[in-house]
A protein has these predicted regions:
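Hydrophobic residues embedded in beta-strands of well-ordered beta-sheets
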Residues: 34-35, 58, 101-102
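Short N-terminal mixed-charge amphipathic segments
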Residues: 38-65
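Generic detector of well-ordered alpha-helical segments enriched in charged/polar residues
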Residues: 2-9, 13, 76-83, 131, ...
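Well-ordered alpha/beta subsegment
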Residues: 90-121, 125-128, 132-139
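Charge-rich, low-complexity N-terminal segments
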Residues: 1-48, 88, 96
Length: 139
């Protein structure tokens, strides 16, 4: 867990909280076999970002909504819109993990602290934009 946490500390310049691009961050390691750090941004706490890594890449994931929140009659149209939105959001992509829709981005394991911080900010901004764009498909 320390390797990923150390990179976050370098990226945000603190031990467990800090500010970047006018946003205040807080992060917490999540216990388990896989190294995961939850990153919460002030005033966006309902959309935490989960950061994990493998031998070759880091993945940042932000869960957006649950499958039960999708209006059934609009599901197919929503999926089409999500596919269309992947192109204008080149640093983030839509996905689904179990019954939860998510937006995610990937970085090289060798990414700089600045790159990690930038990805967290971009992913958070894109998550807010995605929820706004998809609101007509959700209960």
């Amino acid at each position: 867990m320390n390797n990923l946490l150390t990179k976050l500390e370098q990226a945000l310049g603190m031990s467990d909280t800090g500010s970047l691009n006018g946003l205040d961050y807080e992060f917490n390691p999540i216990p388990g076999d896989v190294e995961v750090v939850q990153v919460a941004i002030k005033d966006r706490e309902e959309l935490p970002i989960y950061l994990t890594q493998s031998d070759s890449q880091m993945i940042c994931i932000c869960y957006l909504w649950d499958d039960t929140e999708v209006i059934p009659a609009k599901r197919a149209e929503m999926m089409e819109v999500m596919l269309d939105m992947n192109i204008p959001m080149p640093l983030s992509s839509f996905g689904r993990i179990g019954q939860r829709y998510a937006i995610f981005g990937a970085l090289s394991i060798d990414s700089s602290a600045d790159d990690i911080a930038r990805e967290l900010t971009v992913l958070s901004d894109n998550a807010l934009d995605a929820i706004e764009a998809m609101s007509e498909y959700l209960n």
